[in-house]
């Protein structure tokens, strides 16, 4: 039998990750091989956000950045998001160490991860925090989610993955025991056991009323009654006679997306309303949609001491061949003489079933969600590519929807009101 300490955690309520509504509880098991004096037994819950950035000017080597022969300038940043301890021994009011006999001892504890980042109150004007941006200031009111918390850099084989792993948000529970070794204390190397926990706050799971606004936009993230917003293609398509055509997406709910949201159904408020707008009468032409590609782009930024690195990646959500010819004689004529026609994609056998992130995709070790904290910012945008055949000429149009706030869980059910009361309320006489 050897003296050791073991940390045991009760699983989160959902079995996957803790939220600010969960009580993080567990026990510390202290096994003593012989009678021992215990100076202190404690449990610490700590959250940190760490980044390292590399100067672009020094990245001109064929070697991987982690190669010791690669020369670069690096900056580091560490923010303490949360730090709370629970003392288990000695009991409250007892200052001296406690002598315990050879045995196994078990002590319970509990925490709650709530509130905003602890470090925010100490930010200086020169701290270069992403939270200083008004578009992200609401994130400072709540703790950020775990991110890259299971990576230690081992096994990284590409430059792309190396840079992606230079930022992390990690929450740990650590049990420590200061015990006597012979006639001496060993405070610099106490017995300890540490566990990494996964934390995902409610603001990253699904929209919370009045809690968030779209990054870089004044639009409310979820507003089912909002007027449609128009997202136009980056460039017009000019036909042989000088007539121009512009694809547009009109949506009141594309500033955000939940997991399992339908993307092309008209009722979803996403890509269900795609229009072609012509500058004049196009009836002499033929326009056919031949292919549709939808991608989600991720932008992850790390900052440290005023230097910022950005990591870009792309996830293809859908690539579907089509053969839909636009009926140019049925276009709606607008007041300015332009004409528009809607693409009827909601009944397509593939597009009508397409739901966002149905497979609960893990991207580089993380589920898909947006967040911003002091030194890390994770953002997304949609790219819709429409491939046409205009008068037998192949044409490609690109529509960008930026930014898009991505939520990790499905949308909460719509409010349905209270059920009707089946009986008449009683009458009381004075």
Curated annotation (Swiss-Prot):
Polar residues composition-biased segments: 63-72
Listed InterPro entries: Arrestin-like_C, Arrestin_domain-protein
Region ranges (Disordered): 55-75
Record bears the keyword Cytoplasm: yes
Main location: cytoplasm
Organism domain of life: Eukaryota
Compartments reported by the entry: Cytoplasm
GO MF: protein-macromolecule adaptor activity; ubiquitin protein ligase binding
GO cellular component, one term: plasma membrane
Record key words, sorted: Cytoplasm, Endocytosis
GO BP: ubiquitin-dependent endocytosis
PANTHER family hit by this protein: ARRESTIN DOMAIN CONTAINING PROTEIN, FI21816P1
Family according to the record: Belongs to the ART10 family.
Function recorded in the entry: May regulate endocytosis by recruiting RSP5 ubiquitin ligase activity to specific plasma membrane proteins in response to extracellular stimuli.
Protein name per Swiss-Prot or TrEMBL: Arrestin-related trafficking adapter 10
Gene: ART10
């Amino acid at each position: 039998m050897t003296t050791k300490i073991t940390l045991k955690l009760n699983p989160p309520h959902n079995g996957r990750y803790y939220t600010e509504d969960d009580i993080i509880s567990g026990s510390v098991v202290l096994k003593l091989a012989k009678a021992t004096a215990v100076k202190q037994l404690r449990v610490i819950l700590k959250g940190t956000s760490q980044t390292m950035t590399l100067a672009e000017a020094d990245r001109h080597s064929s070697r991987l950045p982690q190669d010791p022969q690669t020369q670069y300038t690096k900056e580091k940043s560490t923010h303490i998001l949360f730090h709370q301890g629970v003392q288990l021994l000695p009991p409250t009011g007892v200052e001296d160490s406690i002598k315990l006999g050879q045995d196994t001892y078990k002590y319970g504890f509990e925490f709650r991860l709530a509130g905003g980042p602890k470090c925010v109150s100490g930010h200086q004007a020169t701290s270069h925090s992403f939270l200083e941006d008004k578009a992200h200031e609401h994130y400072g009111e709540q703790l950020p989610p775990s991110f890259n918390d299971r990576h230690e850099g081992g096994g990284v084989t590409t430059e792309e993955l190396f840079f992606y792993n230079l930022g992390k948000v990690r929450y740990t529970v650590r049990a420590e025991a200061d015990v006597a070794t012979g006639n001496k204390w060993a405070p610099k190397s106490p017995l300890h056991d540490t566990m990494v926990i996964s934390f995902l706050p409610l603001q990253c799971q699904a929209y919370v009323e009045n809690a968030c606004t779209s990054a870089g936009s004044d639009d409310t993230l979820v507003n089912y009654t909002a007027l449609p917003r128009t997202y136009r293609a980056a460039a017009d398509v000019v036909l042989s006679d000088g007539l121009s055509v512009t694809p547009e997406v009109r949506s009141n709910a594309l500033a955000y997306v939940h997991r399992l949201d339908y993307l092309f159904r008209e009722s979803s408020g996403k890509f269900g309303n795609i229009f072609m707008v012509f500058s004049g009468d196009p009836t002499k032409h033929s326009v056919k949609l031949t292919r549709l590609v939808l991608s989600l782009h991720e932008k992850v930024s790390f900052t440290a001491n005023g230097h910022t690195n950005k990591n870009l990646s792309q996830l293809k959500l859908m690539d579907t061949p089509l053969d839909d010819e636009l009926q140019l004689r049925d276009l709606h004529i607008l007041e300015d003489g332009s004409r528009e026609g809607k693409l009827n994609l909601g009944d397509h056998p593939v597009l009508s079933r397409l739901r966002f992130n149905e497979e609960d995709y893990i991207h580089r070790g993380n589920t898909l969600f947006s967040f911003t904290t002091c030194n890390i910012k994770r953002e997304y945008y949609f790219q819709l590519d429409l491939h046409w055949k205009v008068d037998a000429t192949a044409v490609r149009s690109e529509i960008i929807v930026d930014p898009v706030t991505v939520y990790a869980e499905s949308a909460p059910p719509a409010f349905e009101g209270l059920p009707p009361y089946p009986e008449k309320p009683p009458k009381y006489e004075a």
